[in-house]
């Protein structure tokens, strides 16, 4: 091509109805559903699938989303059956099982654990099958407003090419990159909670017995909590989420530090006696709890981690991203047909998402505190409080009045217990807020800033 042809190619602007930034669960969901509604959708993922991602444990409330999306059987085929979540307890077994089939809401009685690289790839390919133009190795570099709602996007490929897109709407599902929130200076560090994680994958770890074999197991230690997540092919995801102070003191290699950390919980370490760390590979990441001060504006909307990220303890990330993407598609669809209703719908959705995150946050912020630990280690189902917690663990936090009433009652009981030991609770809160002011910068994953 001659120079004139090159210039013409650069100046050409490709037209579409919607651009979706990011090829994770939220982005793939949005792209698939918008394409199904007849819109011309371009989905842009800067990497290539399959690519590694943490967050392997799904919630029961994911299942209705999978069914509406048309991928439930694909998830079932690739996942490990998850009947519940196990937490340490002062009983003969050493743990309590919060079985999902005891939930009081309408949540399904089980979930799945998946390899995220396979799960994310399947969802992205499904978006393509639904009609989205799903591109990989294409990174959005800049977005500028081209009208009241339209946007112009500058895109670069990993082959060294560049082009422009004009979109009537942009869905930002860029994950922790938080493309729009970062560039529009909307991103806010969470002043109440920060943590960091270190983890690896083991082969040969001991699972629970019987129906509990596929459960996620949660353990506590002095600086945070640990997980064990059974994955396909006999692999166990094992890691620790800790206050930044703990990870910042690491002087040994990531492998040595992980093993030293896991040994602090004998019940977990015992399950790893016959296990082998796969490829001796250990990853470290900061969780960087944050949110955006606004979910969207004229012609753009944030989905999933591009809007907010809390903490992985209750495995809520994939569900909040995909369910949020479903609702975001409704906003985009209505806004493209009737722009006058856009901001009203967006404010309603933002209020809904923030309310669910606030309900999760109540448990997350206090999870390592003495009162919450006592309530999880010695659960009592008076007034169906334990079943209300199970519904929360299942992700049923939006539209079930009975569940929300039980969670409000749980908070009241928590307050009573806290008053009994208010000095200790105050010390824990003071420590948590001090940790939230720290910044951990030792991450080794692509999600962590260099």
Question: What are these model-predicted stretches?
Answer:
Residues 78, 246-331, 337, 341-347:
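FAD/FMN-dependent oxidoreductases across multiple families
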Residues 104-125, 248-253:
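Short beta-strand to alpha-helix junction loop
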Residues 51-92:
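N-terminal FAD cofactor-binding segment of flavoenzymes
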Residues 10-24:
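Beta1/beta-strand and adjacent pyrophosphate-binding region of the FAD-binding site
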């Amino acid at each position: 091509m001659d120079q004139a042809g090159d210039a013409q190619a650069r100046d050409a602007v490709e037209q579409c109805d919607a651009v979706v930034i990011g090829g994770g669960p939220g982005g793939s969901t949005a792209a698939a559903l918008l394409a199904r509604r007849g819109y011309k959708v371009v989905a842009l993922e800067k990497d290539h699938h399959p690519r590694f991602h943490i967050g392997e444990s799904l919630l029961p409330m994911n299942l209705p989303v999978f069914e509406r999306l048309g991928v439930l059987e694909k998830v079932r085929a690739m996942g490990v059956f998850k009947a519940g979540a196990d937490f340490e307890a002062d009983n003969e077994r050493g743990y309590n099982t919060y079985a999902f089939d005891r939930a009081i809401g309408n949540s399904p009685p089980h979930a799945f654990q998946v390899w995220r690289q396979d799960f994310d790839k399947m969802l992205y390919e499904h978006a393509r099958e639904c009609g989205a133009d799903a591109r990989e190795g294409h990174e959005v570099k800049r977005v500028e407003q081209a009208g009241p709602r339209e946007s112009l996007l500058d895109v670069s490929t990993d082959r060294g090419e560049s082009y422009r897109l004009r979109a009537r709407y942009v869905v930002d599902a860029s994950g922790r990159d938080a493309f729009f929130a970062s560039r529009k200076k909307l991103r806010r560090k969470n002043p109440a909670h920060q943590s960091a994680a270190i983890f690896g994958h083991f082969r040969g770890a001991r699972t629970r017995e019987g129906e509990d074999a596929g459960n996620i197991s949660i353990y506590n230690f002095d600086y945070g909590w640990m997980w064990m997540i059974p994955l396909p092919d006999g692999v166990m995801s094992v890691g620790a989420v800790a206050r930044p102070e703990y990870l910042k003191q690491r002087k040994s290699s990531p492998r040595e530090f992980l093993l030293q950390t896991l040994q602090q919980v004998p019940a977990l370490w015992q399950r790893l006696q016959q296990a082998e760390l796969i490829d001796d590979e250990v990853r470290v990441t900061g969780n960087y709890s944050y949110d955006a001060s606004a979910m969207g504006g004229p012609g753009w909307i944030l989905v999933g981690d591009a809007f907010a990220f809390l903490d992985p303890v209750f495995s809520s990330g994939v569900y909040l991203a995909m369910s949020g993407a479903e609702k975001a598609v409704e906003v985009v669809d209505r806004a493209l047909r009737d722009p006058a209703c856009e901001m009203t719908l967006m404010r309603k959705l933002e209020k809904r998402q923030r309310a669910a995150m606030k309900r999760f946050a109540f448990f997350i912020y206090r999870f390592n505190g003495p009162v919450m630990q006592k309530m999880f280690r010695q659960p009592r189902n008076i007034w169906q409080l334990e079943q209300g917690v199970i519904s929360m663990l299942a992700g049923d936090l939006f539209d079930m009045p009975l569940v929300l009433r039980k969670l409000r009652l749980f908070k009241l009981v928590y307050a009573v217990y806290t008053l009994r030991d208010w000095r200790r609770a105050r010390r824990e809160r003071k420590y948590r807020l001090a940790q939230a002011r720290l910044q951990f910068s030792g991450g080794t994953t692509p999600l962590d800033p260099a």
